[in-house]
Every structure is written in structure tokens, then in C-alpha cells.
Amino acid sequence: MESNLSSFNKIEQQINGSRKISNYLIGGMLTIGGIGFILASISSYTGRDLLPLGNPSSLLFIPQGIIMGAYGVIANLLNIYLWYLVFINFGSGYNSFDKVSQSVEIKRKGLFKDIEVKLNFDEIKSVKLDISEGFNPRRRIALVLKGRKKALPLSGAGELKPLLQVEEEGARLAKFLNVNLEGLK
């Protein structure tokens, strides 16, 4: 969550989506691996080496060639899905807090349509810091709304910022919205 514009009356935060280096690396590996498995399957069927490495034409088509072809098809289906998410920049968007109009606007890029939430300041109960350490750490800022049990997350998925930065952003936002800050121990 990056603050692009912060003034006395307005805070805007850009949220990064699925265009991350890790997704590009995984997509590249899936592409190469999926095509490699399909070429190995075709090589075992035709008896001609289509890959520069190894000798896949010596594999029996049943069962090794068929299994490698299935792995290749599954890898390429996952690959198409992942590249689609990267292409549309799934999860990207912004958070906008405006003191003049007393409104909050949260917008994210969804799978098939954009997700947009508009709130008034009086609907916000508090700002919550959701911090958990361990094998799968989570550090996110969320809005606790009046009349709802679940908090509305403001941080992007997979963002892992330093603890001090998350605490400072949460405190600044709570002060701006004039609400309590929850989750500090």
C-alpha cells in the first residue's frame, strides 16, 4: 500500500496487483515446463526427438508419453490462467479517503469486473491491524465497519511490509479518520 497523494484533506493509496516478479517467474517456468512435457509426449508418440535435451523418443507412449502429455496440458492451462491474471493486473486498485466529502472509496480489479466499495466516515468503527507471524505471516490494515463482523482489508494480497511501516500507516489512517486503532499489543 503506497501513499501517492497525502494532504490534509485527502489520502490516496495505490495497491499493487498480480504484476509481481514472482508471478512472471512462475509463469515463465510453467510455460517452458508445459511445452517441454507436451513435446516429450509428442516425441514418444512419433519416435522423433523434438527436444534438444534427453532422448524422449525412446519413452514408451503408453503410459509415460500419455502422462507427460497430461502434465503438459495441465501446466499450460494453469499457465494461461496465471498470464491472464497478470495481464489484467488482478487485485490492483486504490484506496481513497476524503475528509471534505467524508467518504472512502476502495476499488480493486476483479477477475471479470471491477470491485468498488464506497463508504461514509460514520460507517467506520475503527482501523484494525491484522498481524500474524510464523510460517505464513500476514501484516495488513483493515477497516472495521459498524454492524459487520468481518473487517474490510485495505492492503493488497501478498504484501509483506515491515511491521513498523504497517503500524505507522495504520496509526496515520486512524488519526485521519478520527477512529480507534485496533490490533496493537
From Swiss-Prot:
Q: Name the InterPro entries for this protein.
A: PSI_Ycf4_assembly
A Pfam family this chain is assigned to = Ycf4
Q: Which GO terms describe its cellular component?
A: photosystem I; plasma membrane-derived thylakoid membrane
Keyword Ubl conjugation listed? The answer is no
Primary localization: membrane
The lineage's top-level taxon is Bacteria
Q: Which GO terms describe its biological process?
A: photosynthesis
Please report the record's description of how this protein sits within the membrane: Multi-pass membrane protein
Report TM segments: 24-44, 66-86
User: Keywords of this protein's UniProt record, alphabetized?
Assistant: Membrane, Photosynthesis, Thylakoid, Transmembrane, Transmembrane helix
Localization, UniProt: Cellular thylakoid membrane
Q: Does the keyword Flavoprotein apply?
A: no
Report the sequence similarity comment from the record: Belongs to the Ycf4 family.
- Any idea what job this protein has? Seems to be required for the assembly of the photosystem I complex.
What is the designated name of this protein?
Photosystem I assembly protein Ycf4
Gene assigned in the entry: ycf4
